[in-house]
Swiss-Prot record:
The active site is at Y151 (proton acceptor). It comes from Staphylococcus aureus. The keyword NAD applies. SUPFAM superfamilies: NAD(P)-binding Rossmann-fold domains (SSF51735). This is Protein CapI.
Amino acid sequence: MKILITGTAGFIGSHLAKKLIKQGHYVIGVDSINDYYSVSLKEDRLKSIGKENFTFNKVKLENYDDLSKVFVDEQPEVVVNLAAQAGVRYSIENPRTYIDSNIVGFMNILECSRHFNIQNLIYASSSSVYGANTSKPFSTSDNIDHPLSLYAATKKSNELMAHTYSHLYNLPTTGLRFFTVYGPWGRPDMALFKFTKAIVNDQAIDVYNHGNMMRDFTYVDDIVEAISRLVKKPASPNKEWSGADPDPGSSYAPYKVYNIGNNSPVRLMEFVEAIENKLGKEARKNYMDLQPGDVPETYANVDDLFRDIDFKPETTIQDGVNKFVDWYLEYYKK
């Protein structure tokens, strides 16, 4: 199968490309390789994918003409849209970047998918869409009308836009609400990377909300395993869906949203301890208030994921952290 992945030079995208190629698929990579963080890290991720059954296109999603040319030239059957401007905190200071990448860019993905008869569009949403919701665990049937950051608002917008195209054009769309993904080749702006780097270099780490936080950390291999199964399972209409009692996570149209999380929140200080255990070194800690746009806890209900693709992420936090630290020390030769 020919599968187009946007964000192929990114953290999840590079892992997914390797997974799908190993399964025998042909992967068409798309990425702008912007400088939001280390360009060399992105280029090294691309190198790690190799060249067999893989082609790469340096394209910005905001440029419809360039993007549509990739669809014309490569004729993909499935699209996995992982390209986005990431980061809750960054969105507060750089809002326009999020509109360009996450709204305009996704609109172009939808248009290309519609015009080039894509059989299955899978796209990254985010656990941040749950915003002010405090019911736990977070369920795709929950209301998500109160986002706490522009990043979260753009991700909810993506889900609404996808539903519109599923309704109007019968385009199968599947949105994936990722919960705090971590692992080798991770982004430098994410907690695991920042904490590991700081501890290795004898620098203090910033611990938000004075350590009173919980995250449903999800190992990257579990994320890509779920996506690889969903590649073969396009969204289909929910025959039991009712407009009188609408389920936000499905539809009468070929539209579905899943949580992909570990279904097992970990306390932030336990996460820090896992890094300390692996490095054999205690962190110096700066305890700070909760940051704007952040939430104190995330917790994924993954019942429908297990029901539909017989998969539930299960990598333990210590195992996942160990694999990241091993990669970090090797990559930076510490």
